[in-house]
UniProtKB/Swiss-Prot annotation:
Keywords: Calcium, Disulfide bond, Hydrolase, Lipid degradation, Lipid metabolism, Metal-binding, Neurotoxin, Presynaptic neurotoxin, Secreted, Signal, Toxin. Residues 1-19 form the signal peptide. It comes from Bungarus multicinctus (Many-banded krait). GO terms for biological process: arachidonate secretion; lipid catabolic process; phospholipid metabolic process. Ca(2+) binds at residues 55, 57, 59, 76. Its EC number is 3.1.1.4. This is Acidic phospholipase A2 beta-bungarotoxin A3 chain. Belongs to the phospholipase A2 family. Group I subfamily. D49 sub-subfamily. Expressed by the venom gland. It is found in: Secreted.
Length: 147
């Protein structure tokens, strides 16, 4: 093997080792993003729904500021309820679902962690699709508006 080949091979191995330390997105988050993309208007991206209002994004406090923020509030509470199911972590729980005819179908036995989490995400995604997106409610001053 030529020295140049060894150098390239070494670089590839180092790159792969570095990539192995990057934590993957939980499958649940990917599923939820796909549901949101399926239900929201084409001109919006799922990312526009993070840091919206008082509850869309990490955490939440105060009263929801509009219908869309209320979707996130209900979703947060739904995840809280799901977390009470034995061995259930809603943020990492995988589940099965189907996107069809402008709706979302969740599979699995009723009451199981997977089904409850899927239903939480389904309800929120459909709610996003039915709620008005107000540009001025993105990246609001939560210390001021969410008490």
């Amino acid at each position: 093997m030529y020295p140049a080949h060894l150098l390239v091979l070494s670089a590839v191995c180092v790159s792969l080792l570095g990539a192995a330390n990057i934590p993957p997105h939980p499958l649940n988050l990917i599923n939820f993003m796909e549901m949101i993309r399926y239900t929201i208007p084409c001109e919006k991206t799922w990312g526009e729904y993070t840091n919206y209002g008082c509850y869309c994004g990490a955490g939440g406090s105060g009263r929801p500021i509009d219908a869309l923020d209320r979707c996130c509030y209900v979703h947060d509470n739904c995840y809280g309820d799901a977390a009470n199911i034995r061995d259930c972590n809603p943020k990492t729980q995988s589940y099965s679902y189907k996107l069809t005819k402008r709706t979302i179908i969740c599979y699995g036995a009723a009451g199981t962690c997977a089904r409850v989490v899927c239903d939480c995400d389904r309800t929120a995604a459909l709610c996003f699709g039915d709620s008005e997106y107000i540009e001025g409610h993105k990246n609001i001053d939560t210390a001021r508006f969410c008490q």
